[in-house]
Amino acid sequence: MEAIFEAKGVTKYFGGLKALDRVDLTINRGEIISLIGPNGAGKTTFFNCISGLIAPDEGQISFKGHKISGLKPHKITRHGISRTFQNLRLFAEMSALENVMVGGFSRTKTGVLGAILKTRSAVQEERWLSSKAIELLEFVGISEHRDNWARNLSYGDRRRLEIARALGSDPSLLLLDEPAAGLNPRETQQLMNMITQIRDRGITVLIIEHDMKVVMGISDRVIVLDYGVKIAEGLPTEIKKDPVVIEAYLGKDENVRQDA
């Protein structure tokens, strides 16, 4: 397998708190990896380090052989990494189509001035963005809402739109932060199908998720964090039976344990 992502010794402090403690992770092209652990384990902090919202204090993150730790988010997006957020970050008073087009703007070359002046290249790129956005809305199953404001969509459809927006930048690695949060069982199954279809499009996926049915159902490997430390890594069947994981996470929550 070809490794496209590597984190070595990633450490992050917030004051006197060590939120991440020398976390190592290698991701191979085409994998679906789940990152699990109790609340406060450092999962979102790790995502934030990868996507450039914060910089690690120690260690290094590389993608496709290039160091990306410490880069600004827009530069990391240009390298081919995109993400969603647990708390949806959509433009409420923009249409679903426009939200996805914004997601793809990082791939354009015209720039803001060209867009304002409506240069020929800007018009061509806008047409390309619109066509790409329509295809992605069809892919996630909400193309009929393309002209609706994001705030008027149902919660489940806003979740789908968030994924379409992230796909708009044409990523090689997609980070999904609790994509199943708040979804009903039917929507959750549809999400699982969608994630495997995303992988089939050649996109590697790293997921933070608490729903063990999702984790165990679609993951190639599972990584477990606890208090900022990676305590386990393995196949879903291995993680499910790991006594350290059961003690630290699965065994703490009756609902989680039953779902697993």
Regions found by a protein language model. Give the residues of each.
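Glycine-rich phosphate-binding loops of nucleotide-dependent enzymes
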Residues: 1-260
